[in-house]
Amino acid sequence: MSPQTETKAGAGFKAGVKDYRLTYYTPDYETKETDVLAAFRMTPQPGVPPEEAGAAVAAESSTGTWTTVWTDGLTSLDRYKGRCYDIEPVPGEENQYIAYVAYPLDLFEEGSVTNLFTSIVGNVFGFKALRALRLEDLRIPAAYAKTFQGPPHGIQVERDKLNKYGRPLLGCTIKPKLGLSAKNYGRAVYECLRGGLDFTKDDENVTSQPFMRWRDRFLFVAEATFKAQAETGEIKGHYLNATAGTCEEMMKRAAYARELGVPIIMHDYLTGGFTANTSLSNYCRDNGLLLHIHRAMHAVIDRQKNHGIHFRVLAKALRMSGGDHIHTGTVVGKLEGERQVTLGFVDLLRDDYIEKDRSRGIYFTQDWVALPGVLPVASGGIHVWHMPALTEIFGDDSVLQFGGGTLGHPWGNAPGAVANRVALEACVQARNEGRDLARQGNDIIREAAKWSPELAAACEVWKEIKFEFDTIDTL
């Protein structure tokens, strides 16, 4: 035995497998304002006590490993370790628990969502002692939130850029999402924008394919945008997807969009990655571009109720990483979204201070200390009959995005856009007059359709369309 080993052994070092509870389960711990707090939904393996499982989560996502190591004595574990400070059973679920874990702020690099996620969810989700694990919520302390620049511009600056106030913004995803030539794509954009929409959008998987290279698309779309803008007198935009295979190529596309003078670009932030997203957000801030964020791949991560990461966490991560819009689901359309849960993370995106509210899935009070807000985008299977509900649910600070609900109009793209704009204006006026959109919504749409043949035709086409499936992700 070497002298160093003898010295360490004499100081009390004892090799062996760790009992995590002895070090990482601390029910008497009082959380600090600077702690990053996490709420995990755990499903331990049979025979594993919840206290041991919660302690293992805290250990494996902070300083711990499976065995005792002599280098533990070279640092202060009490200063740097994560702590499981509370465990509660999930009502109505067998062998599921919410484990609350506190992490010291010094564990995380300033301004890096990538490092935050690598630490908290990077390894522990494959831990054998757990059958399943889901990160339900994070509390980002004000001291850490201040290290992020957040959205490039935020809600108020976007409204000022667009000179549009007092109503939700209207958008449309161009369809078919793949296969159009750049010139025909630009034509579809023009028809939608001249009909009354504020934005049109590249679908998330439109980047630079053989049928439509990115530079051609950018050129034709810019021409369409400026033509519609000149005809209507309104500022228009199209979300040009800058997502690419490398960060260098992505930044080149963003720079070209800036040279063309368009107001907004787009990024697929989960498939592109947080590092790329933050870099693009910084570029947009410095160069006056709005940044639309698509959440492609989110359901792979967030849809299962007992394993993965809840979208409210991904939404918080996006607000820190940077984006002016993000898709959030609709509550009423074809995509997953329970009302109270959706409204919870919509508030986390828009508001400065959000109180803890378990009825909406918010586990911690969140103070963003004036980090700019993000506009929620409602899209997926919505049409004119949904307009009253969408206006009532999402309010003015939102983007209501109709793809098939615009392009599927029997008279074409421009009449489809007219129908949506008329429906929106009618709902906003009715709301401002004190009418109840939830109860009188259909009547409001019918009244507006009497003087808008485009809206009347849309109402007839989609009168029977519903997506009535039970949501998977409930409280």
Swiss-Prot record:
Modifications the protein undergoes after translation, according to the UniProt entry: The disulfide bond which can form in the large chain dimeric partners within the hexadecamer appears to be associated with oxidative stress and protein turnover.
What protein is this chain from? Answer: Ribulose bisphosphate carboxylase large chain
Modified positions (N-acetylproline) in chain numbering:
P3
Site (Transition state stabilizer) found at K334
Q: Which Pfam families match?
A: RuBisCO_large, RuBisCO_large_N
E.C. code: 4.1.1.39
Q: Could you tell me which residues carry N6-carboxylysine?
A: K201
> What GO terms fall under cellular component here?
chloroplast
